[in-house]
């Protein structure tokens, strides 16, 4: 895993340099069109479920109803935010998470802390490796496949990891981003919540 960490650091620095103009432009656009804060921050489970703060570009407003409840995602997602998501630009701040060691470039996506007690024993194995910006599930359906299938693919990655597999995933990710494939579930602007799929791990 030392090779994986060295590659993550080198690639993250390189990608931050290459995308610096895009990042700065996006910061300006988000601040102008959506407002502050520019970054969306949320606590997610990392390696072995240890919490860390995930960074993304903000794509939604904080509009609320008369009772103070957030409006549905499809209402709060702006046209600017939709474009940022389509181009996967919202994920670029996660390169900072890679530098910090919270994320790897490749690994199971970090989901919500609320999901931890809902996993089966097998599904929980996805946390045996560091989470990533992209992963085996992302190039095999992303948000267009079921939660159970995603977790199955995540565990397959854990059991079959190799440096060359990571390179393959990164190359295929570039193609997926270019064609904007599988970004959202049908009729959902964000992934539908996971509510469990059987006997959970103790």
UniProtKB/Swiss-Prot annotation:
Protein's name in the database: Uncharacterized sugar transferase EpsL
Topology with respect to the bilayer: Single-pass membrane protein
Coiled coil, from the record: none
EC assignment: 2.-.-.-
Designated gene of the protein: epsL
Spans traversing the lipid bilayer: 10-30
Biological process according to GO: polysaccharide biosynthetic process
Family matches, as InterPro entries: Bact_transf
Keyword line: Cell membrane, Exopolysaccharide synthesis, Membrane, Transferase, Transmembrane, Transmembrane helix
Organism lineage string: Bacteria, Bacillati, Bacillota, Bacilli, Bacillales
């Amino acid at each position: 895993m030392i090779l994986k960490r060295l590659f993550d650091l080198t690639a993250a620095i390189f990608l931050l340099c290459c995308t610096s103009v895009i990042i700065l432009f996006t910061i300006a656009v988000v601040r102008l069109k959506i407002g502050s804060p520019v970054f969306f921050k949320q606590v997610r489970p990392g390696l072995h479920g240890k919490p860390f703060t995930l960074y993304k570009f903000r794509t939604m407003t904080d509009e609320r109803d008369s009772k103070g409840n957030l409006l549905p995602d499809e209402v709060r997602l702006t046209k600017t935010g939709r474009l940022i998501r389509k181009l996967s630009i919202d994920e670029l701040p996660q390169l900072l998470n890679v530098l910090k060691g919270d994320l790897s470039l490749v690994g199971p996506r970090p989901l919500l802390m609320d999901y931890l007690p809902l996993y089966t024993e097998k599904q929980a194995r996805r946390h045996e490796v560091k989470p990533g910006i992209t992963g085996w599930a992302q190039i095999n359906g992303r948000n267009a496949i079921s939660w159970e299938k995603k977790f199955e693919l995540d565990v397959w990655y854990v059991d079959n990891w190799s440096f060359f597999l990571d390179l393959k995933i990164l190359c295929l990710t570039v193609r997926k981003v270019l064609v904007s494939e599988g970004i959202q579930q049908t009729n959902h602007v964000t992934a539908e919540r996971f509510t469990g799929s059987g006997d959970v791990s103790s």
